[in-house]
Regions:
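AAA+ P-loop NTPase nucleotide-binding core of proteostasis motors
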Residues: 2-24, 28-34, 39-135, 139-148, ...
Length: 407
């Protein structure tokens, strides 16, 4: 029995000669073993899933769309679908600790639209608003395990890296899988031969999309037996898939039994422009294109993006908060130079993008080709202003590879 008068831990009661270290506080003592035990408890608590989103903090669908409007021009239908889906997804995260009998299912999203219509930008902007880890994955580099290419698990490795290997943060992040149409199987019928970069990848994606614990190699690359794995639960990760699905208009037209302008068809019951066909897209069209039914079922929210017309491209050039024109004005401003673009230059940029079907992404390429020489020369020139004329813009674009590569 411990002698009276000896100092003892206020928590476990052990005396100072029974422990390695006894620390003194204002009104009591604590031993090293109790400190270690308290540290373990705190660490376990920190690893427990937390509802980081409170209802009062979570942006409402209208607020999400308003934020998207600041960065993305047009595509109101896709914005509304995305806003509602994201809002419901993060409400679902708030429900996960409750004992509610009604379990809200995941609302993964698939966006269909031609290149340059804003699929990636929409997903990136959503992640920016919610301040959650976000990563973009190109589906074309994915292959089944054991084949040359990237494993499906590499998707989660990238998300972990963005989250600085904070598993809890990664488990509430957003993954954008681009070019999902490129892993479609070649026909609507199941393949009798192994398709390691098509149907095989779709099968591999299923466990990620539906929600399961996946062992992820910490530094990426292939798995090997002696490697330490990081378990990541994908149940609360929001997956947004995007693809151009070139030629799917034919599938839609066949289903609707209509005539599409630009395609030969016997039926001529109603004329719908090719650009409007996407609004009629249904899950069965994705299946006809080559996505397996299981994948389609795990991407319940289907929305389409319209091709960008000239007026929309003109707005994209100058109106968003981070428009390419505003970015170059800011870059020049940092060098003490006032940059101006004549109105006919802006019209020329848009006309070039429309003529060569470059989309919104092409606007940046054109502006960069116009500005490259100026950005090289002006910082050393000592001038305080720079005006871009149409003649100068035409000369620079004609010299660049932007047009040459599209001819």
């Amino acid at each position: 029995m411990a002698e009276k008068g000896k100092r003892r831990c206020s928590f476990c009661g052990r005396t100072e000669d029974q422990v390695a270290l006894l620390m003194t506080g204002m009104t009591g003592y604590i031993c090293n073993e109790c400190v270690e035990h308290a540290h373990d408890i705190l660490r376990e608590e920190a690893l427990l899933p937390k509802n980081d989103f409170e209802m009062k903090e979570l942006p409402k669908p209208k607020e999400i769309k308003a934020f998207l409007d600041e960065y993305v021009i047009g595509q109101d239908k896709a914005k509304c679908a995305l806003a509602v889906s994201v809002y419901n997804h993060y409400k679902r995260l708030m429900q996960r600790d409750s004992a509610d009998e009604v379990e809200i299912e995941k609302s993964n999203i698939i966006m269909v639209g031609s290149t340059g219509t804003g699929k990636t930008l929409l997903a990136r902007t959503i992640a920016k608003l919610l301040k959650v880890p976000f990563t973009i994955v190109d589906a074309t580099v994915l292959t089944e395990a054991g084949y040359v290419g990237e494993d499906i698990e590499s998707i989660l490795t990238r998300l972990l890296q963005v989250a600085d290997y904070n598993v809890e943060e990664a488990e509430r992040g957003i993954v954008f899988i681009d070019e999902i149409d490129k892993i479609a199987r070649k026909s609507d019928n199941p393949s009798i031969t192994r398709d390691v970069s098509g149907e095989g990848v779709q099968q591999g994606l299923l466990k990620l999309l539906e929600g399961s614990v996946v062992n992820v190699p910490p530094q990426g690359g292939r798995k090997h037996p002696d490697q330490k794995m990081i378990p990541v639960n994908t149940k609360h990760i929001l997956f947004i898939c995007g693809g151009a699905f070139d030629g799917i208009e034919k599938k839609i037209a066949q289903r609707l039994n209509t005539h599409v302008v630009g395609y030969n068809s016997v039926q001529n019951r109603m004329h719908i422009d090719k650009g409007d066909m996407m609004q009629y897209i249904m899950p069965q069209d994705l299946r006809s294109f080559g996505l397996i039914p299981e994948i389609i079922g795990r991407l319940p929210i289907l929305t389409s993006l319209r091709p960008l017309d000239r007026a929309t491209l003109r707005s994209i050039l100058t109106e968003p908060k981070n428009s390419i024109i505003k970015q170059y004005v800011k870059l020049m401003e940092m060098d003490g130079v006032k940059l101006t673009f004549n109105d006919d230059v802006l019209e020329y940029i848009v006309d070039t993008a429309v003529e060569y079907k470059l989309g919104a992404r092409g606007l940046r390429s054109i502006v960069e080709s116009i500005m490259m020489e100026k950005m090289f020369e002006i910082p050393s020139s000592g001038v305080d202003s720079c005006e871009i004329t149409k003649e100068y813009a035409q000369k620079q674009v004609e010299k660049s590879t932007v047009i040459k590569c599209t001819v």
